[in-house]
Amino acid sequence: ALVIGSDIVTNAEQAAHVNGMLAHADETDDSHAPSLSHPGCAVVPAAMAMGEREKASGTQLLRAVALGYDLCARINLSLHPYDFRQAGHSTHSFGPSFGAAAAASLLAGLDYKGMRHALSYTAQQCS
């Protein structure tokens, strides 16, 4: 997968990570105020990298991004984000991690069990 703004091609995981860092680098990333999150800098790079790897169509990519944004917001909202943040946890990375995992899992064609495992792994990484 391509690292945006360069001619570097690497695996999907590394491209998603680098592109996510680039998306957040200038602090102009999107915000979802009710969930205290920035979904785009995690969801979009993960979806683009996996979409490139899997040769996804534009429709498939948009569907995955929409799923990622939705899950990101719902996860954070379910945790009562202001209380979650007050307890010392990062709302900016928690929900977006789940959104990125869901988007990438959808594009990878994982079945229900595979997606469940991917989200379980995400929960372990966020804890």
Model segments located where?
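N-terminal core-entry segment
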Residues: 1-127
